[in-house]
C-alpha cells in the first residue's frame, strides 16, 4: 500500500498532523519510535503553557491565535477533563525586560487582552507573589495552560477512529526519496507515501544529520504548595525573569504541588543515554530556588521532578520548511522549548501541506535558508 502521507514522529505535532490529515480524507500512516504519549521527548510532564502575547516575537501571534481555536475545538472532546485551562498567565520581569517589551508590542499590534500592573498591583492581586519595586506584570487574561499528554492521547485516538494507520514502538531508520515519493525503512519493513512529515523531535538528526538542531537536557519539578496557589483561588500560570536574565515558567498548583521549570540553561547532549533522570545532575533539585526564594517564598520543598529535552535551533526559532531538494518532505523541528502550544496549528499546517494547500501563514521566518 502507498500512503498519501507518512508522519515520522507522533508526539505533539505528529499526533495533531495525523488527526487533521486523516480527517481531511487522506490515507495516513503515523509512526513513532515509542508509544505516544511517552517520556522520551519533549511533551511529557502533564502541562504546557499557552501564551498569546508572544515574548519571542510577533511573528508567532497569528499562529498561536489559530492554535488556540484548535485547542478549544479539541477540548470539546474532553469536556469533563478539558485539555485547555484558561487560568490566565502573568508575565513578570524588570520594567526594561526585552521579553516583556515583545509581549506588550504583540498585545498592541494584535489588540490582545493584556493588562499591565506595577509591582504593588501584582502583589495586591496575588499576595503569594513578591517582586521588586522595578518589576511589572503583563497579565494575559485569555491565556492559560494545556494538558499535553491528554492532548496527544486524544489526537491519536481520534485519528485511529477516523481510519489512520499507526505504527508505534517502531523506529524509522532511513528515509529515501525517488521520483515516486518517499520510502521509510523500519524494523517492521518498508513503507511508501506520496509525502512525508518529519517531526521527530529531539533525535531528528539521527535521520537527517545535516539539520542545525541541538538537543538540550532540561528539567522541571513539582514543589509543595497549598490551595492559595490553585486555579480555584485564581492563581495564574506564569513566566518570570530574574534580574540576572534567567527565565522561569510555572503553573497553578494541583493536588498541593506547583510545577516550575527554568527555560534557559540545561545540558547540551548528543545521545539519548545522556538525558539522565531528574536528580542525577547536581543542580536539578535546586535550579528553581532563586525564583522560588525571591518571587514565591511560600512554596515548600521539592517533591519530585522529571527530565525532558529541547530540540534547539541556533536562533531558537522554529524550523518549518521542506527538505532541501525534496519538496515532498516537510520538516517541523527546532521548536526550542516553546513549541507545544503551537502543536495544533503546526499539525494543521502539515495536513495542508499533504493536501497541496497553500498555508494561511507567513512561514518565511522559519525557513532553513536563514542559517546559510
From Swiss-Prot:
Monomer. Keywords: FAD, Flavoprotein, Oxidoreductase. The keyword Oxidoreductase applies. Its cofactor is FAD. Binds 1 FAD per subunit. FAD binds at residues 4-34. GO terms for cellular component: cytosol. The keyword Oxidoreductase applies. It catalyses: N(alpha)-methyl-L-tryptophan + O2 + H2O = L-tryptophan + formaldehyde + H2O2. This is N-methyl-L-tryptophan oxidase. One of its GO terms (molecular function) is sarcosine oxidase activity. Belongs to the MSOX/MTOX family. MTOX subfamily. Catalyzes the oxidative demethylation of N-methyl-L-tryptophan. It is an enzyme of class 1 (oxidoreductase). It comes from the Bacteria. Its EC number is 1.5.3.-. The modification S-8alpha-FAD cysteine is found at residue 308. Pfam families: DAO.
